[in-house]
Every structure is written in structure tokens, then in C-alpha cells.
Amino acid sequence: MKTTIKNLILSAALVVGGASCVDLDTAPYDRETDLTYWEEDPEAAVKALNTCYTYLGNMDEQLYCEAMTDNAYTKQPNDATQNIGNGSYSTADPYVKKVWDGRYTGIRMCNELLENIDRVPDLDPELKKRYIGEAKVLRAYNYYELYTKFGDVPYTTKVLSIKESMSIARTAKATVIANVLADLDEVINGNYLPTSYDADNKGRITRWAAMAIKAKIYLFEGNWTQVKNITSTIMTEGGFKLFESYAGLFEIANEYNSEVILDAQYRPTSREHQMMYVFLPPTLGGYSQLSPLQELVDSYIMLDGKTIKETGTSFDESHPYANRDPRLKATVMYTGNSYTLADGTEVVINCEKGEGKDGYGVGSDCSATGYYIKKYWDNTYRATLYSGLNPILIRYADILLMNAEAL
């Protein structure tokens, strides 16, 4: 990548003279600027688009939000997700600010690309159309995540100056939704996006992902006809199917499997997360800040289809995890369950109070609930539990459930 550098030549008269004037309104020499970046780099568009994907979603947001519900608990009393869960949060809480800042940074990146893509030289028209489609869907998803959490939010499709960003007003939620749906309709109806990608481009927004996001928006608004129509199209034309193993669905060996419609992109060494450090037991190097709650465990039904409290249930308190929905074993680490290491070794965990290294109450790094998380365990992790495993944002099971709800 080359950057044009303009030399400033000061005349000898100015240097020698007692008074001189230096033009401070010049481009910096040590980095590219917006003045030249788009025109000089033929890959400027795809590089900018890749940056937009960084803000699509992340693993810690995916998992920590469970602590706002009856599914999980975070043992740090000053944690913002705990505050949201008990209703004591404020806009100054770190998690709230992180979601707000992250989503609006993603929106700004999309707006930067959309405003400047015409300046990129020799960009293939079909690629340009696709990049615009990807950016508009990414922006739509960011707005969806904002208005579903905050209601009325500032809406803009331009890059704001600092002054403008300090004075922009909130836009009515209904207007935000209408604008987001208009963008999605443009992309979907205009065939901006392919239905699939080659191996080098897996993880990018497809036509089906755009439609799935549109279905989620309509589901949130209770427009059942639209939800049914969109999800039915995905079901009949998308070529997706449920993955054969629920546990395997969330393993790095099975990324981009038949059920994944949209996931946030991570990659070993280049973009990783360290969420396993947050939810694993001490035996595997974790400190279990985030732990499943009993309410989540109790919600898994028996193999006979009955709940554990239903009359005639086969639930046995002396063997509480036997004959349960297999998703329980794949999601929650309980006493007798195990993590499989890369070499095939099974590490069996004992969560019982006062027992071993991982038992409830044994140490500050142990679970606060007597359970650990198993879902999204990545046995290919690097040192200190760094992982490149992608969190799934939308999968085919979501489409089936939305379709059923809309009937």
C-alpha cells in the first residue's frame, strides 16, 4: 500500500528570516488519511467492510447477557449484567455503555464505507453492489440490537462530525424500524447478496441472513404474516437443515455447518476471545465468573417429554441428570459430566460442595451456583484459553421456531 507524501519546501528566505508561517492544515506523513485512502487503495472497500464485521457481535456479549436472566449468574457484585438482571442498572454501567458504543461504532463504520465506496478505483460493479448490501444489512442489524434494548435511538445514515454527534436527537422507534426494513428490502429484492460464498468468504452476510434478520424484526413487532412468509421461504429454498448433534453444533470443528445462518467471525491468533477463562472450572484454568443457575437446569425436560415437576414424571432426585433432554448435558457442566480434551481425554468435573478443586465453595475461582458452562467449550484453545470459536447469532432452529410461533 502506497501513500502519497507531499513535501513541504520552505524557501531559504523564510528559514533565514525572523518571521515564518507553517501551514498546519496538512495531511499527516505517518499514516493514511481519509483524503487519500479511498482513492489510493483498490482494496479499501473490502478492508473497510471487514472492519464493519468486527461489530456484528462478540462472544462475551452473547454469554454475559444470560446473567440478565434466570439462566445464569455472575458473581461479581459490581457487574453491569447483574445490575440489569435485578433492575438496578443505569446508563453509566459498563455493559450498557459497551453495547451502545459498540453498536454505534459499527454503524459509523458502515456509514463510512457507504459514503466513500464510489471513490474506490476500479471496483468491480458486482462486488460494489455486494459490499453495499453487506454494509446495509450489518447496519440494520446494529440498529435492531439498539432499538430492541433502548427503544427510541439516534438514527443516521451519514458519518457525523463530533459536533453533530453531540446534538443528534433520538428517532422514534417506529421510524428506525421503517428505515431498517427499507434497507433490508432494497438488499433482498435487489439481489445484492449471494445465497452462499466460497471457502475464502464464508461468514459473510448472505441473502438468507438478511431475510432471517428481517424475520426477527417482524417477530419482535408481532407481524406474524411477514414472519411466516419469510421463514417459509428460507425453509423451502435455503437448503439449511438441523445439525445432527446439538453438542457438535457449537464445536469449532463444525463451524459453518448446515444449521448456521449467521455467526460472528473469530479466527485463531488474528481475532480471538477469552470467554472460556470466564466460565470454565479451575481444573481447566478458568475462574467461573459466569455460571448457570438452577432455574436453567430445571427447565430441561425429561426424555418422556414431561417436566421434572409434572405429575407422573420419571424424574429421580437421587439421579437428577439421568434421562434428561440431551441438550442439558451439552450446555451445563454438572457433577459427573465431562469436558473432552483435544487428545480425547475426558476431564470429569465434581461440582459438589467442598469437593475436589471445582466443588461449590472450595475457592473464589469456583462456581457460585454449583454448575459450570459446557456450551462453546473449545478444546483447540491456545495458551491461557484463547479461542477462535465463532458464536452463532442465527441458526436454522431459530427459523423453525419463528415459523411455528407465527402459525
Indicate where each model-derived feature is located.
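Flexible, polar/acidic helix-loop-strand segments at domain edges
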Residues: 315-395
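Proline-centered turn/helix-capping motifs that create local helix->coil transitions or kinks
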Residues: 22-25, 60-62, 73-77, 146-155, ...
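Secondary-structure transition into beta-strands, especially the periplasmic turns and strand N-termini
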Residues: 4, 18-20, 119-136, 221-236, ...
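Bacterial Sec-dependent N-terminal signal peptides
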Residues: 1-30
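Membrane-proximal, proline-rich intrinsically disordered regions
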Residues: 20-64, 300-311, 318-319
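Hydrophobic, small-residue-rich alpha-helical packing segments that form membrane-like cores
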Residues: 155, 159-255
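Conserved, well-structured interaction surfaces
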Residues: 41-57, 79-150, 165-178, 184-198, ...
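Polar, glycine-rich mid-to-C-terminal structural blocks
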Residues: 213-222, 231-318
